[in-house]
């Protein structure tokens, strides 16, 4: 680096002379564009030679792909250029050769642009293109002026930014480089497509955009680090005309004054046709013909934009410093995955989107997307902010200057402006970020402000294309391409730059609500620099917006949860776009809350209503049949066996174990390592035990009050005191912490762990208190009948949310069953508990006895590798049991379990059987099922070989049973049957995914 700097410093005097000559020549119009470009690029390459070497390994894979792609394109199109430039290229490094390729491409595009410009000039003469292309070209014009202004500011010496801000700049430069590369890649694709369609006007826009973005990125490279800043300022000074240099030197000498500002503004308008840097000069000279047609319009507009961007820069740099969220890495990671499409907020319903399609289309076309892009990039650099005093003065001066022009221009401009305003209001509504920073300056269209959000990019083709029909067709295919090409890089970038403000702060996945009408008056005061009659219009729009927000607030609560027409979902629209996972989760969570509100005291009533639906005779018949089938859970298979007599005795301290074995280690631990609970004792000097819940394989559970937390009720799980159980307890502790950290807002229905401690060598885990598990609920309320369909629907929503969180954390629960699902007092909210069997998805040891038998998936039984699908299978079995009160597959052995599963779904696919480690226990060499049963007469085992197994169990008949269901409930039962069919697929690859389950009609549609 040092060597490069000294070398370039040595060359500077020579370059300055050359450049001054060049700029004098430029004023006389003597230097060709080619020469200026060559000089510019050669100088730049020399300067940044070492930086590219350091960067090499940072983004190698992405950039290599881009370079290959570019070279392929260029060599195809410009072979004749290469012949001409061969003599130059032979002695050059490959990096310089790519530069010359760029120049060759630019020349070629130059010719095309001249043709297009001629066509457009003809159209302009006839007055056809007032709103469309003309305004876009004007947008580019003012954009290049903005760049000139940036140079001037850099030269005037605004170096007040600290070192931290310079590092921030570095990060952003890296990002900007990547985005410009990606953009040029996808644009080159689009350009070839446009050429084949012979749509020249579009091609023209693309070309201009390509050039300006390229020049932009070149210039941004100059301000890389504080050590290089002086150099870049020299360069800016060189590339300007002598008169401007003289004037700016005078300015530096003087103290800043309001007149200074006036001089600056007037200089801008006078020296529009002077050159500021070779590349800007190109695009400007092209547009000059266009500019001369409506100079007043342009000047007014560009100044308008300039003053606004200044204010926005200063304001945003202030607010950004305050608003940097410190996020936990786990949360960051998850947001990267889930928040793919941030800027489509819940406020933006399909209805609102289509309020004024035509004018919006027009205004979108009439404004340069590049401009917004550039503005948003500038707004992040702290060195370009103005002091508040100067800002106010320049604003008032400009307002005075603009007044007469505005009167003249009101007619052609008002319509696009109005629509911009209305769109701004709409999007202001939609973006929750505004709620947090009312002082922040809004850009013209807040949705487009986040220049690096993938969604904004994917929308840009829609803005460019002309006819609405073509716009729709083009948008779908192009946005798909872009999203694919950018999502990977974007995600990596987002996680890397923690310094920058989080783009998705305030997105609804972080538990925020859609009510932003906080400071709409203040917001609007910032940009009401239009005429007085527009004030009334703004006020009117604001009132309309509030009405719409109110309407949708109620709609979100009342309307059916149908996928296409849900206003509260940001993505769902009539254009067959599937909702994002985040929207689905939001919607389901809202539904669960609503169910909780509505059914606080109705649980028992709904179960009784279900009892009444059963016909009396068949009820008697079923009870007689039921006597034959023993209750599968009377034994200690029950996780929290509240009715387990020896546990009650043990709780009372009457257990006979101690008397029988006087050589026990301690008085408080029994022979099996369980802690002897005494009602009334105090654990860890703060938990006063008042009740005994039950006992599981790993532990027993007591109810206690926390004296340190105002007698808050808790459940304390006391792990058995032996090595294996302690290990299991610590593993459960680790998984619970991971799950709780990933779900700070408690939306995903996994049990909350408060803390843990050791008591007399037993590990104790302190949980939130929950009254009973679903096994007990079924025994108490729904024995042989099951629960109401409304309750089953809500429970299924909550279970799928729990599965979603498990998958996010890469955890398998591996023991989901009604015993391990706890409910609150009102039976409206459930929590998945008991993570003693849980494992990381990668550590899935193949064992045929994982998961309780009735809920064990077929892939576990045959010894095939497994993943999240085993938990989905368990949930399916549990849901059937909740609705019917009966166990779906009450198999006595693994072999019997397979037989019952195949009775429902038909024979297991041979492809799946072959992958099983234990297939020989259940299938013969020809893959026929060997059904092992005990002969009732001889009571000996007999094997029946079954080559084909036809599904004989009718799920729907079992679900409906002997109920006389009303029509709405019958519909829900049919939906439940369909959902269970998809969950209980024998092949885990064909089983429904969690997201698909959350979108199923049974979950989405209310009763």
Curated annotation (Swiss-Prot):
Which amino acid positions bind ATP, per UniProt? Answer: 693-701, 717
Q: Where mainly located? A: nucleus
Mind telling me which CDD domains this protein's record contains? STKc_PRP4
- What domain of life is recorded for the organism? Eukaryota
What is a GO molecular function of this protein?
ATP binding
Q: In which residue ranges is the amino acid composition biased (Basic residues)?
A: 39-59, 67-81, 179-202, 214-230, 302-315, 342-367, 438-497
In this UniProt entry, the residues modified to Phosphothreonine are 385
Q: Which GO terms describe its biological process?
A: mRNA cis splicing, via spliceosome; regulation of mitotic cell cycle spindle assembly checkpoint; spliceosomal snRNP assembly; spliceosomal tri-snRNP complex assembly
Please give the GO cellular component terms listed in this UniProt entry.
Answer: kinetochore; nuclear speck; spliceosomal complex
Q: Compositionally biased, Low complexity: which spans? A: 157-168, 562-581
Compositional bias, Basic and acidic residues, is annotated for 82-91, 247-270, 316-325, 395-408, 415-429
Kinase as a keyword of this entry, yes or no, is: yes
Biased composition (Acidic residues) is annotated at 518-533
Protein family: Belongs to the protein kinase superfamily. CMGC Ser/Thr protein kinase family.
Quaternary structure (record): Interacts with CLK1 C-terminus. Associates with the U5 snRNP and NCOR1 deacetylase complexes. Identified in the spliceosome C complex.
Query: According to its UniProt entry, what is the function of this protein?
Result: Serine/threonine kinase involved in spliceosomal assembly as well as mitosis and signaling regulation. Connects chromatin mediated regulation of transcription and pre-mRNA splicing. During spliceosomal assembly, interacts with and phosphorylates PRPF6 and PRPF31, components of the U4/U6-U5 tri-small nuclear ribonucleoprotein (snRNP), to facilitate the formation of the spliceosome B complex. Plays a role in regulating transcription and the spindle assembly checkpoint (SAC).
Q: What is this protein called?
A: Serine/threonine-protein kinase PRP4 homolog
- Organism equals Pongo abelii (Sumatran orangutan)
Q: What is the lineage of its organism?
A: Eukaryota, Metazoa, Chordata, Craniata, Vertebrata
Which gene is the coding source of this polypeptide chain? PRP4K
């Amino acid at each position: 680096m040092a060597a490069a700097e000294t070398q370039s410093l040595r060359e500077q005097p020579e370059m300055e002379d050359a450049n001054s000559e060049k700029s004098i020549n430029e004023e006389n119009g003597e230097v060709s564009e080619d020469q200026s470009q060559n000089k510019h690029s050669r100088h730049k390459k020399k300067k940044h030679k070492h930086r590219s070497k350091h960067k090499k390994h940072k983004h190698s894979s992405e950039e290599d792909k881009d370079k290959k792609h570019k070279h392929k394109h260029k060599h195809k199109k410009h072979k004749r250029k290469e012949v001409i430039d061969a003599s130059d290229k032979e002695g050059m490094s490959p990096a310089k050769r790519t530069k010359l390729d760029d120049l060759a491409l630019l020349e070629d595009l130059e010719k095309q642009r001249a043709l297009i410009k001629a066509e457009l000039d003809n159209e302009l003469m006839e007055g056809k293109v007032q709103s469309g292309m003309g305004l876009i070209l004007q947008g580019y014009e003012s954009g290049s002026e903005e760049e000139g202004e940036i140079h001037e500011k850099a030269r005037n010496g605004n170096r007040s930014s600290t070192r931290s801000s310079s590092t921030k700049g570095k990060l952003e430069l890296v990002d900007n480089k990547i985005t410009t590369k990606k953009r040029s890649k996808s644009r080159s694709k689009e350009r070839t497509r446009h050429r084949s369609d012979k749509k020249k006007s579009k091609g023209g826009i693309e070309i201009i955009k390509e050039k300006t973005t390229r020049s932009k990125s070149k210039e941004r490279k100059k301000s890389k680090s504080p050590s290089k800043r002086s150099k870049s300022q020299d360069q800016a000074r060189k590339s300007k005309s002598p008169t401007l240099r003289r004037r700016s030197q005078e300015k530096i000498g003087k103290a800043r004054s309001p007149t200074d500002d006036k001089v600056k503004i007037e200089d801008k308008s006078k020296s529009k046709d002077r050159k500021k840097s070779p590349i800007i000069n190109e695009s400007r000279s092209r547009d000059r013909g266009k500019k001369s047609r409506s100079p007043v319009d342009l000047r007014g507009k560009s100044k308008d934009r300039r003053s606004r961007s200044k204010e926005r820069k200063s304001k945003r740099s202030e607010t950004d410093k305050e608003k940097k969220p410190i996020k936990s890495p786990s949360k960051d990671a998850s947001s990267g995955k889930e928040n793919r499409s941030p800027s489509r907020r819940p406020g933006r319903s399909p209805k609102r989107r289509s309020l004024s399609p035509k004018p919006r289309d027009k205004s979108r076309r009439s404004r340069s997307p590049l401009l917004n892009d550039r503005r948003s990039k500038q707004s992040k650099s702290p060195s370009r902010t103005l002091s508040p005093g100067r800002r106010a003065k320049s604003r008032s001066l400009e307002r005075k200057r603009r007044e007469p022009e505005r009167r003249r221009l009101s007619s052609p401009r008002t319509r696009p402006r109005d629509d911009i305003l209305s769109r701004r209001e709409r999007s202001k509504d939609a973006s929750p970020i505004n709620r947090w920073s009312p002082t922040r300056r809004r850009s013209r269209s807040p949705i487009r402000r986040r220049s690096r959000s993938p969604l904004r990019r994917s929308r840009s083709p829609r803005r460019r294309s002309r006819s609405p029909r073509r716009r729709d067709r083009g948008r779908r295919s192009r946005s798909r391409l872009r999203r694919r090409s950018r999502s990977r890089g974007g995600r990596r970038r987002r996680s890397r730059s923690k310094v920058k403000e989080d783009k998705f702060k305030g997105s609804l996945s972080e538990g925020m609500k859609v009510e932003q009408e906080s400071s709409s008056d203040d917001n609007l005061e910032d940009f009401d620099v239009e005429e007085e009659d527009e004030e009334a219009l703004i006020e009117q729009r604001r009132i309309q917006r509030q009405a719409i927000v109110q309407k949708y607030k109620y709609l979100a609560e009342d309307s059916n949860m149908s996928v296409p027409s849900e206003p509260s979902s940001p993505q769902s629209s009539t254009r067959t776009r599937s909702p994002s996972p985040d929207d689905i989760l939001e919607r389901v969570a809202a539904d669960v809350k609503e169910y909780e509100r509505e059914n606080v005291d109705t649980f028992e009533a709904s179960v009784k209503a279900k009892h009444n639906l059963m016909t009396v005779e068949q009820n008697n018949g079923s009870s007689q049949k039921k006597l034959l089938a023993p209750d599968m859970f009377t034994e200690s298979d029950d996780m929290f066996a509240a009715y387990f007599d020896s546990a009650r005795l043990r709780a009372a301290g009457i257990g006979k174990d101690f008397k029988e074995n006087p050589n026990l280690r301690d008085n408080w631990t029994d022979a099996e390592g369980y802690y002897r609970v005494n009602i009334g004792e105090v654990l860890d000097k703060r938990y006063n035990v008042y009740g005994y819940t039950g006992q599981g394989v790993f532990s027993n559970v007591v109810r206690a009050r926390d004296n340190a937390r105002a007698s808050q009720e808790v459940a304390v799980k006391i792990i058995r005191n032996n090595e294996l159980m302690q290990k299991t307890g610590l593993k459960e502790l680790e998984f619970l912490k991971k799950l709780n950290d990933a779900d700070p807002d408690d939306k995903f229905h996994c049990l909350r762990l408060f803390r843990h401690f050791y008591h007399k060598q037993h590990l104790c885990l302190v949980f939130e208190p929950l009254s009973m598990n679903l096994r007990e609920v079924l025994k108490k309320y729904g024995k042989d009948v099951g629960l109401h369909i409304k309750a089953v629907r809500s429970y299924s929503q909550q279970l799928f949310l729990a599965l979603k969180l498990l998958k996010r954390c890469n955890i398998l629960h591996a023991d989901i069953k009604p015993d391990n699902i706890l409910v609150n007092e009102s039976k409206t909210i459930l929590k998945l508990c008991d993570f003693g069997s849980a494992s990381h998805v990668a550590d899935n040891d193949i064992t045929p006895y994982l998961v309780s038998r009735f809920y064990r998936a077929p892939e576990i039984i045959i010894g095939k590798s497994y993943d999240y699908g085993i938990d989905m299978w368990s949930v399916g079995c549990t849901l059937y049991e909740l609705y019917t009160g009966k166990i779906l597959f009450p198999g006595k052995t693994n072999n019997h379990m397979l037989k019952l599963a195949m009775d429902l779904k038909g024979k297991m696919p041979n492809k799946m059987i072959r992958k099983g480690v234990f297939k020989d226990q259940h299938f013969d060499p020809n893959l026929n099922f060997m059904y092992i049963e005990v002969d009732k007469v001889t009571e000996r085992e007999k094997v029946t070989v079954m080559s084909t197994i036809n599904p004989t169990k009718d799920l729907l008949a079992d679900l409906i049973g002997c109920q006389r269901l009303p029509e709405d409930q019958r519909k829900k039962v049919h939906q439940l049957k369909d959902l269970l069919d998809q969950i209980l697929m024998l092949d885990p690859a064909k089983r429904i995914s969690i997201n698909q389950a959350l979108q199923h009609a049974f979950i989405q549609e209310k009763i």
